[in-house]
Amino acid sequence: MRNIELLAPAGNMSALHAAVRAGADAVYLGLESFNARRGADNFTIVTLKEACDYAHLRGVKIYVTLNIIVLPGEVGRALECARQAWRAGADALIIQDIGLASEIARALPDIRLHISTQMNTCNAAGIRAAARMGAKRVTLARELSVEEIAHLAQVGAEAGVEVEAFGHGALCICYSGQCLMSSMIGGRSANRGLCAQACRLPYELHNAAQRNPLSAPGEHLLSPKDLCSVDLLSDLARAGVASLKIEGRMKSADYVSAVVSVYRRVLDRVYAQEGSVSPARPTEDERRTLEEAFSRGFTTAYLEGQRGNDIMSYQRPNNRGAFIGRVAEARNGIATISAEHELAIGDVLEFWTGKGHAAQTVSDLSFDKKGRARIELDARAKGVRAGDRVFRVRSAKEAFEDDSLEPRVEVEGAVRLRIGEPLEVSFSFARTSQGELAEVRGT
């Protein structure tokens, strides 16, 4: 049985380093054009080459996203972009546009094609169509259950196509790749890399007949929670998923490091016994790490057939973090917090007050005789009162510190000395993304 590949996002070089150090098997990233996250920092061909060299040396693959709808006049430039990405060392290209995928398969047959979730592959016909286009992998639509994924994985195996599934991160309210809300409301097309996040805006619910507002569970009526499949990794492994994808090219290196590290540890427990799949769940600390990295509230959503209010985040459309306790008292600009978990200087806390939410960074920290944390409130948090809930939206201890030399690669060196001949030095290392021995010699 082949282990699930852990596929991590990278919107910049720091996030790439974080993904590799946290244990990703592969990283997906975008160039400056033709990708669905044009708001990320993204990569140039030059920095893509650097990314490929860094990752391949450490046994990690790089997939480049060309995952938007391409206009007729852009096909030539898109093909050239694909060609340059492949020459730079990309291991695969992730494509949304059917026409572009067909053209790449025709003009550049050596390139490995992966079908984006934006192509909305949700049935056997879609899998077989991808195989006819020459694709080697399909990222399935996110609206599928584990049972449906298992069926499509079997269809894919018969057609010679792997299946990839999203396992963690933001969900869309519309079908994968079929959303026109951003275009209609914000004048920015999600299928052109410019999603305006219209589903995260506040809305009112009205009775169309009587033209009056109705009561609603919150303002953000179209905002889903975040997908979290960390409790289902054994099920996804048995279903035949080849790659588990983490969303987040617009998110920070801290997020990438935290989320990838948790999924890496749990997946390793799933495959603890070689050749079999073991039940594995996250620890409470691991679950908290995911919440603090970014959370609108978590759901398994369609993976377990959930389609109702349970998958929605009506109250807020952004990061809520992890609950850590309540304010015991607040006076003279000092908040005393009965915290259930240890706080640290540099943490970002959010107080849920009767008048809204107030966030601040912990710049000083002391403790009273009862061991309760005491922090000085800044101007934004002056409305904090006793009883208010406190959430941590960024953990200083989980912050990622970039170092492009990490993780270091173990090498073996040998020196050869012979009288009358030049000194010869050789270095070799066994781990590359292709699993081959690499050796360098010089005199």
Model-derived regions, located:
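Alpha-helix capping/helix-boundary segments
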Residues: 99-100
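Active-site PLP-lysine loop of aminotransferase-like
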Residues: 122
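Surface-exposed amphipathic alpha-helical tracts and adjacent flexible/coil segments at the periphery
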Residues: 1-21, 26-36, 51-52, 58-68, ...
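Aromatic- and glycine-enriched glycan-recognition loops and surfaces
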Residues: 40-49
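Basic, amphipathic alpha-helical recognition segments used for DNA target recognition
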Residues: 103
